[in-house]
Design a protein with these regions (language model features):
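A short acidic Gly-Thr/Ser loop motif
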Residues: 73-77, 101-103, 210-220
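Acidic, glycine-enriched active-site microenvironments
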Residues: 13, 179, 183, 219-220
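Short glycine-aspartate micro-motif
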Residues: 69-73, 95-97
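Catalytic phosphate/nucleotide-handling subdomain of diverse soluble enzymes
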Residues: 84-86, 109, 190-242
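Conserved ATP-utilizing enzyme core subdomain
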Residues: 93-193
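Conserved catalytic cysteine-centered active-site region
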Residues: 21-22, 26-45
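Active-site glycine-rich loop that binds ribose-phosphate moieties when present
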Residues: 19-23, 49-65
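Short beta-strand-loop/turn "lid" adjacent to the catalytic site in phosphate-handling enzymes
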Residues: 1-21
Length: 242
């Protein structure tokens, strides 16, 4: 799919929709290669969430092992892939994937706000590491409706954008810039640790060591989480033939 400009997941009373910026025929002509596209739109048309799309690719590229395998993608939104074991009673489970909630989006917006637009992200997690997390607010936020939903579910910047950041900052009242970055950073870590343990039996997943993509090294506030450690992982693909 192309760049996602707008995404609205489905509800029981409303069809989902998504707006992608992509000209697949032009891309096919320029590359002189077949281009398979519109996976997101097709999934939504069939009643799916339309996101995340990466779980199938994760399963195809990495395969199954003797136990559960978890893969975490920390983009603007955190999405999680859980690949079941290759054998045993749990080997019949399907690959699971869903959007946990905000990863970098609230952090980046907070950095942009408190740097007056001079910075767009928290380099090496330095700003979060210099602050203190408002733990009480993280616990309250985890009770919000989206975070209580079970998979499948998807979300985007439409829900966790600038307005959402402003709402959270107003809730915390007087907060330093560093604390305003440390707290949503902690929220991202809590969401990822929170979701697998809430899956209904028999899909309840034991604690996982999660590889991290995009931002290969987790920021200090995320790495310091008391939950299962995050192990950096890089996937190397073979060079194209010829």
């Amino acid at each position: 799919h192309g760049q996602t400009l707008w995404h609205r997941p489905p509800t029981p009373k409303r069809r989902g929709a998504s707006w992608q910026l992509l000209q697949a025929p032009l891309l096919a002509q320029l590359l002189q290669r077949p281009v398979v596209h519109d996976f997101r739109a097709a999934d939504l048309a069939l009643g799916g969430q339309g996101a995340p799309l990466v779980p199938r690719a994760d399963a195809a590229l990495l395969g199954r092992i003797d136990g559960w395998r978890g893969l975490l993608n920390l983009g603007g939104i955190a999405n999680l892939t859980l690949i079941p074991p290759r054998c045993g009673p749990e080997g019949t489970h399907a690959v699971l994937g869903w959007d946990c909630g905000p990863a970098n989006t609230l952090i980046d917006l907070a950095v942009d706000r408190f740097s007056d637009g001079l910075r767009s992200f928290d380099l090496d997690g330095a700003m979060a590491a210099a602050g203190s997390c408002r733990e009480s607010w993280v616990h309250r936020w985890l009770e919000e409706p989206y975070f209580q939903e079970l998979p499948p579910k998807s979300t985007g910047r439409e829900c966790f954008g600038r307005d959402d950041l402003n709402r959270r900052l107003e809730q915390m009242l007087s907060v330093s810039p560093a604390d305003a970055v440390a707290t949503p950073t902690r929220l991202s870590a809590a969401l990822v640790a929170h979701d697998p343990s809430r899956l209904p039996a028999p899909q309840a997943i034991p604690p996982l060591a999660l590889p991290v993509s995009r931002g290969r090294h987790p920021p200090p506030a995320l790495a310091a989480s008391p939950h299962p450690p995050l192990h950096p992982h890089a996937l190397r693909l073979p060079p194209p033939p010829g």
